[in-house]
Amino acid sequence: MKQNEPIIVKQLLNASIEQVWEALTNVVHMRKWYFDVIPNFEPRVGFKTQFLVSSGERNFTHNWSVTEVVPNLKICYHWTFNEYPGESISTFEISKKEEQTLLKVKSEIITDFPTDIPEFKRESGAAGWEYLIKESLPKFIEKSIKF
């Protein structure tokens, strides 16, 4: 993926702001809808975590570093991979919209990722975020509304 327009995905969720925040920042919940191999996570500036995701023959060691936290409103983290150059910032913003909660996720490329790797094509990145935010997270929230 290259430094161009960020990928932005929005989703209305049938949950409170607090419940959405918990789903986004509590590692037990994150493992159920996001990445099941996340070893740990804390919504704290400076917190770092690392985990491996394999896709066929390729490995992607994810490195996250939390860069901004506004509880129940916003969390950002810097995202790199050990195996490949490139870096991005993922921003999750939540707000109230009538009786629902609006989640806006933005993935911004800071330094280009290799374009010859299929997982780094813009279409692949957009499809991944669409799946996570519009399918996986809402299903988790529907099943676990009282978590």
Question: PLM features: residue spans?
Answer:
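Hydrophobic-ligand binding "helix-grip"
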Residues: 40, 55-102, 108-112
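Extracellular beta-rich ligand/substrate-recognition surface
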Residues: 1-4, 52-56
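Hydrophobic ligand-binding cavity/cleft-lining segments
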Residues: 1-39
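A solvent-exposed, acidic/Ser-Thr-rich amphipathic alpha-helical stretch
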Residues: 37-47
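Generic structural detector for well-ordered beta-strands
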Residues: 8-14, 42, 52, 65, ...
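A conserved amphipathic terminal alpha-helix motif
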Residues: 109-147
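Hydrophobic pocket/interface hotspot
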Residues: 20-21, 30, 49-51, 66, ...
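Residue-level preference for beta-strand/loop junctions
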Residues: 4-5, 45, 58, 86
